[in-house]
């Protein structure tokens, strides 16, 4: 009796299995796709893209047969369906009811005639029960000038970078002479790439054609998070001066340095009165996994700049004369209201946005002034001045908005200090990926940094970072307030 029951059960299971394998040719039964358009952002020619995945799903009760899968052109895109990448073999593929297949897609683009990005499109066609269903493929192809070496080090005496096409740096690039970068030039930096410049540097962008240093990942980290929002993608830009050379001059205007480990590191071995000089203006240094701007034994003039969101100091100063006017220095890296950890290292709560080191005996004399700046962030002490005694520090703070304890009156006057109730300094101090809210350090309409600046200092800087005229009673920071559109 028991043996008969087992046989009956096996027969029933076989009947059910047979019913599940029924392949329907009903033309009303169609496939569903997790995406009907697959977009690859910028794909560098000859290098290929990352791989994207689409789920091909049969929502119906019965199995259906995919008669054929075709790519209309097949020049720029390659597919793999359920482990098969030979397009000629993609025929008579059965998908059971309520089952699915994985479709993998990659873009590979040959060199183009245009230097500007070119939109390339193709189409995947699924022939099912007399119907044709499509997945549209799109990619922006971009020619790039690659700089790389088998040794991992590329050395130039002098180097001029033009805006004819972007550059892609793979290795350590050392420029022993002069480095010149034309307006509108974009330099993509591969993981581990960095630049050492030992001579003069001239990098002059414009408001409409800035110079950009950024990582080379142009795809998505997650569905709603572009890779460009992840820090630590490349090493940094180092301007180095050795004691056996004449002091260098560095001029950087409208330069955006984004999402590296260290943004801009300027260092000199000299400790005397003659030091290298840097002018950094109308520029953004944002989202770095260690430091933003480091100045050691350098005379610097920094104005109309945003230096923001670094895991360690946004600004570190030690040795030299540093003049900061109308800058926004905002340290909200990994702020608690951020819904996704897209950063690559641990944030120390006791690290200030600005750290001025007046303790080291092996540096030039440190003299720093901050006028009409914003220095704030997630930490209670966003400004630290390390000095043996306040009267030993030769610096000044005037017309600033500061998140710190009150500074010594010997070097500070007419500043506004943040209170715990100041929650609206900027438009946005967090990142919510699903709502596409990203950090925005333009001033809020109720910002306590509005109208607090010193008007005399502004005479030398009549416009803000984006070219807007400053008011008679100027706002602190690099952005003059405007109503949000």
Language-model features: where?
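Asparagine-centered strand-capping/turn motif at beta-strand->loop junctions
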Residues: 56-60
